[in-house]
Amino acid sequence: RKVRERIFIETKKALLASAVVSTRRKDLHKQLGLKLDRSLANKQKKPREVSLSSGLFSQALGTLASPKASQFLRGLPGEQVMSIEYKGEIGVDAGGLFNDTLTALCDELFSGELNLFLETPNTKAKSRRNLDTFVPNPSLNDPVSMNAFRAVGRLIALSVRSQQYNTFKLAPNVWDMLTSVDLTND
């Protein structure tokens, strides 16, 4: 963990790009499509369960959680792996809609609109380090929530593969668990 801060970002990006290239599936030609309704998402005002939400993440959940994981392995580093279309809006997704949508999905996940993630005690108390970070809600272990967490993982993968470095405000110990780093008391 202590070495992690000393590795230059360009080195990290090169390693990630190498991993994307080596795991790329060349036989996948069909791009996933995502159709969203911004007006429906804007009507939501209170934090809700994923199954009751009309937000963008809940609308995207079916597409993000249902395809086989291999569908997300198409493309080279920086290529968009999914096309985005918004209901009632005219636009060609040449990358901008994709980038904006990934950012909006991340923002929604950590805004309090959904109950998938909870603020860390440090965030609540506004003290010490790792402020503004979140942990998965441990009380959510039903099938719909587990599907939503799977979709979050795929959203992280989409961000890495397309080199859209979005802000997933997960606490450092959550990242450590996701990357199989031994946990410490730091």
Where are the predicted features?
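Conserved beta-strand elements of beta-rich interaction domains across eukaryotes
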Residues: 89-92, 141, 156
